[in-house]
């Protein structure tokens, strides 16, 4: 077992595309852990989706043996954290497992919103942070400007900041020396009762749940009986090991060390991220602080395009849930779409990733309904319910008040686009809280916005309004009372539950009009007239009509009596009337997507 003063646990904090995974790759190469033959980009991002989108979704760890200039041997544990706002809780748990962090900032771009959010999380844990300026090989890099920006916005002293190029490997050895010299060794009592923090877990079809953890106090040995604090279930440790970067089995792990265990745990819910592991016979008196249950924030309906695909979709969702405890689903039925599932996600990126994984890894064709958030409703009898599906909203006469979730958002943007951002936030019912300069030409704007307003197209419009230069980060604040209504879409008098949305009363008319027009363009023409109506309760606020396709029934009459033609036209009219009464309109997938794109026009 290595001595504690020779261990360093660190993570790398960075905004998307600032070179975090590339720096991790170079560290593995410089220390000789990955040979040239095994070399590949984004070595730690094992999922195809992670490599394609260039983001880290799951936390990974790697144990790196390192010999410093002085000849002392160290063990460096790199804990790779997700960088995206949706996975904030996972980031905070990964950071709790570390004792220090490298802050990687792109020297050509400067500080971005998500960098700041994660830095604040690291500062909450009292971490020492080493600033690293990456991409100095680019002609557009400006090291002095970015140093000033970091000092201004975060208050970190950048006199000892290390300028590197992760791509070429320049100065990466200096980063390793700095980790050893400037980051603290882990604290922890080897003789105290076992206390280990779970910061990630995933499901393996052969070994059950694999748990990644950091030992805070005590020693964990193979064969020990352990208990989880949150679930109070006990298990026997059947395998103990570390990733270096491939699996290496070990007999024991002591305070300050990071590793994984397998203990025949059947469900991911039994090894929750943030939970504490302790011994059954000599338990710790209290868990590692900071554990919380992860709650989904965004919901949407997922339906198979073909009813026969329902069972395969259910099996795919079960498999996904094994590897993603934050993802939840329950069966639901829609009159328009048949049987499907109501799924809950941490945020928009999480939702996109799950949908993409279903279509890519499990080959399931999906229809996804418009995303919605959780509203709180107070009814006349004094009860409060949570509504995650617009079609479940009670009758307006039974509602006393409706509450919607608000988020606080920080937007980092260059000077010249401030007007566009302010206009967009005002349009989305935002309340401006703060605005300040972090550098000569970069502004941070803080707004409080209804979460429902950013679920649709906010991010796309923010990017297009700022030529892609803006970055944003948000966190939930609270629930506030709002004047909200449910907008129903009726096709030939029949309400389509999958197209119902909850909108603010002031926007209902505009939204209903735009959606009806969009549907008119996407629903194919039928042999009979199709009426599309947007309604609030009994009141229709917008209507569009798709005219019927017309067959010329009088073409075969050459000359002859007008009554003959009239008779044929009357017969056609009667047939169309009957068809309209009996006929069903098949809604294409584009019709459901139309609801997502209403704001584009």
From Swiss-Prot:
Gene Ontology MF: a single term: GTPase activity
Its EC number(s): 3.6.5.n1
Function: Required for accurate and efficient protein synthesis under certain stress conditions. May act as a fidelity factor of the translation reaction, by catalyzing a one-codon backward translocation of tRNAs on improperly translocated ribosomes. Back-translocation proceeds from a post-translocation (POST) complex to a pre-translocation (PRE) complex, thus giving elongation factor G a second chance to translocate the tRNAs correctly. Binds to ribosomes in a GTP-dependent manner.
Natural source organism: Nitratidesulfovibrio vulgaris (strain ATCC 29579 / DSM 644 / CCUG 34227 / NCIMB 8303 / VKM B-1760 / Hildenborough) (Desulfovibrio vulgaris)
Lineage of the species this protein comes from: Bacteria, Pseudomonadati, Thermodesulfobacteriota, Desulfovibrionia, Desulfovibrionales
UniProt-annotated binding residues for GTP: 17-22, 134-137
Gene that encodes the chain: lepA
UniProt keyword annotation of Protein biosynthesis present: yes
Protein name according to UniProt: Elongation factor 4
Matching Pfam families: EFG_C, EFG_III, GTP_EFTU, GTP_EFTU_D2, LepA_C
Domain of life: Bacteria
Protein topology in the membrane: Peripheral membrane protein
Principal place of residence: membrane
Keywords (A to Z) from UniProt: Cell inner membrane, Cell membrane, GTP-binding, Hydrolase, Membrane, Nucleotide-binding, Protein biosynthesis
Alphabetical list of PROSITE patterns matching this protein: G_TR_1, G_TR_2
């Amino acid at each position: 077992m290595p001595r504690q003063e020779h261990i360093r646990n660190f993570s790398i904090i960075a905004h998307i595309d600032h070179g975090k995974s590339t720096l991790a790759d170079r560290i593995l190469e410089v220390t000789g852990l990955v040979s040239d033959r095994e070399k590949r980009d984004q070595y730690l991002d094992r999922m195809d989706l992670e490599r394609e989108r260039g983001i880290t979704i799951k936390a990974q760890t790697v144990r790196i043996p390192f010999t410093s200039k002085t000849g002392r041997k160290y063990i460096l544990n790199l804990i790779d954290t997700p960088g995206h706002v949706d996975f904030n809780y996972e980031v905070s748990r990964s950071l709790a497992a570390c004792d220090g962090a490298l802050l990687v900032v792109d020297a050509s771009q400067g500080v971005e919103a998500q960098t700041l959010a994660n830095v604040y999380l690291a500062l909450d844990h009292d971490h020492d942070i080493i600033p690293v300026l990456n991409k100095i090989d680019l002609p557009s890099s400006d090291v002095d400007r970015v140093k000033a920006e970091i000092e201004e916005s975060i208050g970190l002293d950048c006199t000892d900041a290390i300028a590197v190029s992760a791509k070429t490997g320049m100065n990466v050895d200096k980063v390793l020396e700095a980790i050893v010299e400037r980051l603290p060794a882990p604290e922890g009592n080897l003789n105290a009762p076992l206390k280990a923090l779970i910061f990630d877990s995933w499901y393996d079809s052969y070994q059950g749940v694999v748990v990644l953890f950091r030992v805070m106090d005590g020693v964990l040995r193979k064969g020990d009986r352990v208990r989880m604090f949150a679930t109070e279930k006990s298990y026997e440790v059947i395998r103990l090991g570390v990733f270096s970067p491939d699996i290496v089995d070990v007999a024991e792990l002591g305070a300050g060390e990071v590793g994984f265990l397998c203990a025949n745990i059947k469900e991911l819910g039994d090894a929750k991220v943030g939970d504490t592991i302790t011994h059954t016979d000599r338990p710790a008196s209290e868990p590692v602080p900071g554990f919380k249950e992860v709650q989904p924030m965004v919901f949407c309906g997922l339906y198979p395009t073909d009813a026969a695909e329902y069972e395969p979709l259910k099996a795919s969702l079960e498999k996904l849930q094994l590897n993603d405890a934050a993802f939840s689903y329950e069966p639901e039925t829609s009159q328009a779409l048949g049987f499907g599932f109501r799924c809950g996600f941490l945020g928009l990126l999480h939702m996109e990733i799950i949908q993409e994984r279903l279509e890519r890894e499990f080959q399931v064709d999906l229809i996804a309904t418009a995303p919605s958030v959780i509203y709180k409703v107070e009814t006349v009898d004094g009860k409060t319910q949570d509504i995650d599906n617009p079609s479940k909203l009670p009758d307006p006469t039974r509602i006393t008040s409706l509450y919607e979730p608000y988020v606080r958002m920080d937007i980092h943007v260059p000077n010249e686009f401030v007007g566009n951002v302010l206009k967009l936030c005002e349009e989305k019912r935002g309340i401006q809280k703060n605005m300040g300069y972090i550098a000569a030409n970069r502004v941070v704007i803080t707004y409080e916005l209804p979460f429902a307003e950013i679920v649709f197209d906010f991010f796309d419009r923010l990017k297009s309004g700022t030529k892609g230069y803006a970055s944003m980060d948000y966190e939930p604040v609270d629930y506030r009372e709002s004047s909200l209504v449910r907008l129903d879409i009726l096709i030939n008098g029949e309400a389509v539950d999958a197209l119902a949305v909850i909108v603010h009363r002031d926007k209902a008319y505009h939204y209903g009009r735009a959606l009806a027009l969009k549907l008119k363009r996407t629903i194919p023409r039928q042999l009979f007239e199709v009426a599309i109506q947007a309604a609030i309760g009994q009141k229709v606020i917008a209507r569009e009509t798709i005219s019927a396709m017309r067959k010329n029934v009088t073409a075969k009459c050459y000359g002859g009596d007008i009554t003959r033609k009239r008779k044929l036209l009357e017969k056609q009219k009667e047939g169309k009337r009957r068809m309209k009464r009996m006929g069903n309109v098949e809604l294409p997938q584009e019709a459901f997507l139309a609801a997502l794109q209403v704001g584009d026009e």
